[in-house]
């Protein structure tokens, strides 16, 4: 399954209709215009064509993620008030139909990121400066938020970092920790997971980032040995080695060469050989890097523009 949102995508190897060349593609949107919510397509990897299948009405589903088995989809409603929410939907990969199971409040405005480990679902609530944790029920529905983290620190950018912003929450590949990017405080936070309480109230600062960086999204390599962070304001990709909760910086490389202060998403190819970092606001495009399999360092391959205007 390939899941696409305005700022995100996730995948699993299964296609639709038994055809390994085809993937189920889901696109999240903002609905303050003509969009209804989530749209599903059948995407052919060989031809690049997408056939529309279905849609589901949901307010501002700007970020979504499928469950590992592809049976469920978890999508935010990115609202800047108390209506901000997370929804669980059942997904039929054959027909593309989505069926709403339940919706629960995030208790933080503008949820902008979702992650799941099959037991819990996390949201990063950007404007609320909070992280929410939702236990998953056996039927795929979401229980109310179990634990919240409230950010408090701010940063040097008087506009972008004036209030706390949590931008991304991810599970570590060993399943022991949760990492959250503290955008305004220029740091990555680490939380220890426990069977009876997935997040303690106290957090440990895993690593500080250079001031005025704006850490946005974090992703781990398929082998679990490395992690990569994209910084929105400084436009860098920072590579880390990873071992039992510890992130050690090994490289910093530029993704945004025009100082647009709008770098956004970061993903690795399924085989871990390439890394993709998106840039916005000026010369929109995808910076592509080759990954050294031995030490995790990056070498820039090219910048692929998304518009001829660049």
Spans of model-derived segments:
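A short beta-strand motif characteristic of beta-propeller blades
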Residues: 51-56, 100-104, 155-159, 203-208, ...
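Asp-box/WD-like beta-propeller blade repeats and closely related beta-sheet repeat scaffolds
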Residues: 97-167
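C-terminal motif of bacterial Sec signal peptides marking the signal peptidase cleavage site
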Residues: 7-8
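Residue-level detector of Asp-centered blade-edge/turn motifs that repeat once per structural unit
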Residues: 68-69, 116-118, 173-174, 222-223, ...
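Conserved small/polar residues in nucleotide/adenosyl-binding loops
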Residues: 305-310
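Short loop/turn segments immediately following beta-strands, especially the blade-tip
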Residues: 42-47, 90-95, 135-142, 192-199, ...
């Amino acid at each position: 399954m390939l899941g696409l949102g305005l700022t995100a995508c996730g995948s699993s190897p299964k296609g639709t209709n038994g055809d390994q060349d085809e993937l189920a593609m889901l696109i999240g949107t903002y609905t303050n215009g003509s969009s209804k919510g989530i749209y599903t397509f059948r995407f052919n990897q060989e031809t690049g064509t997408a056939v529309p299948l279905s849609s589901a009405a949901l307010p501002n589903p700007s970020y979504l993620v499928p469950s590992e088995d592809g049976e469920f989809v978890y999508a935010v409603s990115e609202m800047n008030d108390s209506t901000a929410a997370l929804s669980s939907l059942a997904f039929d990969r054959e027909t593309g139909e989505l069926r709403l199971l339940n919706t629960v409040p995030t208790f933080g405005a503008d949820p902008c990121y979702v992650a799941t480990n099959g037991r819990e679902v996390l949201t990063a609530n950007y404007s609320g400066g909070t992280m929410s944790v939702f236990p998953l029920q056996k039927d795929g529905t979401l229980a109310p938020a179990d634990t919240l983290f409230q950010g408090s620190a701010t940063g040097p950018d008087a506009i972008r970092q004036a209030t706390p912003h949590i931008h991304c929450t991810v599970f570590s590949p060993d399943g022991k920790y949760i990492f959250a990017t503290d955008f305004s405080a220029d740091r990555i936070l680490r939380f220890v997971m426990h069977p009876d309480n997935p997040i303690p109230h106290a957090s440990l600062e895993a690593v500080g980032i250079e001031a005025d960086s704006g850490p946005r999204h974090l992703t781990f390599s398929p082998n679990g040995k490395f992690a990569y962070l994209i910084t929105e304001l400084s436009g860098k990709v920072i590579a880390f080695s990873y071992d039992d909760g510890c992130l050690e910086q090994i490289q910093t490389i530029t993704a945004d060469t025009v100082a647009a202060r709008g770098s956004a998403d970061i993903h690795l190819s399924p085989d871990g050989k390439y890394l993709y970092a998106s840039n916005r606001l000026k010369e929109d495009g995808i910076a592509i890097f080759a990954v050294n399999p031995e030490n995790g360092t990056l070498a820039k391959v090219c910048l692929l523009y998304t518009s001829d205007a660049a």
